[in-house]
């Protein structure tokens, strides 16, 4: 075969290979096009179903949390959540926080918390024992999850806060600013809707737990004035994030701070902290027109910390060990009361739930049920109430729940920071168990050494 014939033969072979390759590519493209057409057709057929589902979800997304039901009858408390945020924060990106609380809509429960603008085990966690700073913000994450930059959403700039859901949107209340002129910023669905200026210019502050909603209106209690003497206390009624009514309590010799409020049969009951002179807890109950009654829990099973040993109670402030205090809660059932309190009488350690069947009105110290929550050898802290509405649970009553803050770090431990994790429980009329669910983190961290 001469050179020209070789060239022609090689060229012919290359052309055949090229034609075959082109045909294969064309076949592949046709196959992909057919497959895509089938998938697109299937998606188009499914679209009406998908749209119907979305429309249905939107149709049930907005309700009114009536709050007209009574509290559910309960015999004990079932563990609901534990976030383990300090343990996780030794290696993970977890916020330095205090004052966590829980609130539920008709669709979900969320943990709200006041950050310090810092992460655990980081240099900016230094000095976070301070309560009020311009770096503090209210944020929230799904209940039971450790609060981190990856699962949390910003709510408000705040060093004192509250939040609740009326069935349509979240209402948040965030207080920030100087001690002598702080302002509460109200947001509804994330949009600023109103503000409340400090009226006594002495550390305006609010609940550090959820506000309470009834029939589309939400209610909160605020304090302005001395932490160790007579102060001023106001109830605010809000609709879609705007204040529509307020009333100042006529409460001489009473001291209300950090109230834990809940709806019950269309009215609101708040159990608060007396930081002035009471080792039992003051309460205020009111209807939707803000007509109110006030008192102290009469039981000889005292609920504050510090406090004296249980003894004879009073329907006014019990003065022994009455100064200072800690945020707490109770649930009223007729003349009876579930009291949540630290186990220790003089430090924020341990936690227990006690049922006093006559404690709302009676002054003796007898009780019939005690359920352990945290051992006295482990740190606790603030505690507060929240509820789950029938629109969430499907029950015909309002389920009472509570959370406990488990404070770690300064001032009791050798760290540069102060933070906490949280646990929560809900009332049930079935089997429960007492145990200890402590924070469980091993300190100090690397940053502390």
Swiss-Prot record:
The lineage of its organism: Viruses, Riboviria, Orthornavirae, Negarnaviricota, Polyploviricotina. The active site is at 131 (proton donor/acceptor), 382 (nucleophile). It comes from Influenza A virus (strain A/Chicken/Shantou/4231/2003 H5N1 genotype V). It comes from the Viruses. GO terms for molecular function: exo-alpha-sialidase activity; metal ion binding. Ca(2+) binds at residues 274, 278, 304. Inhibited by the neuraminidase inhibitors zanamivir (Relenza) and oseltamivir (Tamiflu). These drugs interfere with the release of progeny virus from infected cells and are effective against all influenza strains. Resistance to neuraminidase inhibitors is quite rare. The keyword Transmembrane helix applies. Glycans are attached at residues 68, 126, 215. It is found in: Virion membrane; Host apical cell membrane. One of its GO terms (biological process) is viral budding from plasma membrane. Keywords: Calcium, Disulfide bond, Glycoprotein, Glycosidase, Host cell membrane, Host membrane, Hydrolase, Membrane, Metal-binding, Signal-anchor, Transmembrane, Transmembrane helix, Virion. The influenza A genome consist of 8 RNA segments. Genetic variation of hemagglutinin and/or neuraminidase genes results in the emergence of new influenza strains. The mechanism of variation can be the result of point mutations or the result of genetic reassortment between segments of two different strains. Gene3D superfamilies: 2.120.10.10. It catalyses: Hydrolysis of alpha-(2->3)-, alpha-(2->6)-, alpha-(2->8)- glycosidic linkages of terminal sialic acid residues in oligosaccharides, glycoproteins, glycolipids, colominic acid and synthetic substrates. This is Neuraminidase.
């Amino acid at each position: 075969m001469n050179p020209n014939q070789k060239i022609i033969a090689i060229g012919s072979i290359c052309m055949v290979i090229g034609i075959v390759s082109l045909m294969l590519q064309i076949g592949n493209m046709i196959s992909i096009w057919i497959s895509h057409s089938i998938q697109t057709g299937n998606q188009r057929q499914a679209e009406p179903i998908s749209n119907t589902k979305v429309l249905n979800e939107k149709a049930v997304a907005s309700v009114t949390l009536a709050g007209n039901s009574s509290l559910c009858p309960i015999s004990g408390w079932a563990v609901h959540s534990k976030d383990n945020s300090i343990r996780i924060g030794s290696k993970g990106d977890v916020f330095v926080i205090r004052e966590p609380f829980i609130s539920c809509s008709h669709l979900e429960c969320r943990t709200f918390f006041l950050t310090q603008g810092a992460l655990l085990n980081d240099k900016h966690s230094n000095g976070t024992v301070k309560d009020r700073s311009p770096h503090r913000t209210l944020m929230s994450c799904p209940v039971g999850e450790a609060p981190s930059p990856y699962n949390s959403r910003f709510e408000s700039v705040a060093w004192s806060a509250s939040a609740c859901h009326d069935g349509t949107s979240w209402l948040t209340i965030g207080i920030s600013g100087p001690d002598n002129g702080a302002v509460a910023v109200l947001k509804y669905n994330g949009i600023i809707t109103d503000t409340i200026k400090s009226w006594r210019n002495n550390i305006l502050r609010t609940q550090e737990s959820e506000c309470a909603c009834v029939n589309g209106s939400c209610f909160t209690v605020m304090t302005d004035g001395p932490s160790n003497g007579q102060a001023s206390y106001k109830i605010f009624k809000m609709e879609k994030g705007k204040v529509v009514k307020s009333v100042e309590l006529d409460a001489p010799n009473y001291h209300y701070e950090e109230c834990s409020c809940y709806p019950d049969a269309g009215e609101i009951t708040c159990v608060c902290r007396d930081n002035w002179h009471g080792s039992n807890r003051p309460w205020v109950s009111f209807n939707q027109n803000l007509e109110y009654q006030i008192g102290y829990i009469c039981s000889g099973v005292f609920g504050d910390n510090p406090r004296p040993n249980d003894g004879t109670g009073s329907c006014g402030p019990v003065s022994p060990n009455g100064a200072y205090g800690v945020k707490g809660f109770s649930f009223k059932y007729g003349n009876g009361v579930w009291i949540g309190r630290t186990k220790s009488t003089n430090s924020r350690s341990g936690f227990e739930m006690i049922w006093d069947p006559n404690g709302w009105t009676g002054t003796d110290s007898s009780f019939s049920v005690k359920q352990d929550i945290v051992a006295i050898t482990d740190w606790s802290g603030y505690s507060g109430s929240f509820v789950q509405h029938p629109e969430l649970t499907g029950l015909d009553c309002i389920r009472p729940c509570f959370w406990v803050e488990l404070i770690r770090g300064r001032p009791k431990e050798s760290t540069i920071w102060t933070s906490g994790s949280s646990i929560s429980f809900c009332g049930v009329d079935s089997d429960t168990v007492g145990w200890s669910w402590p924070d469980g983190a091993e300190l100090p961290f690397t940053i502390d050494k």
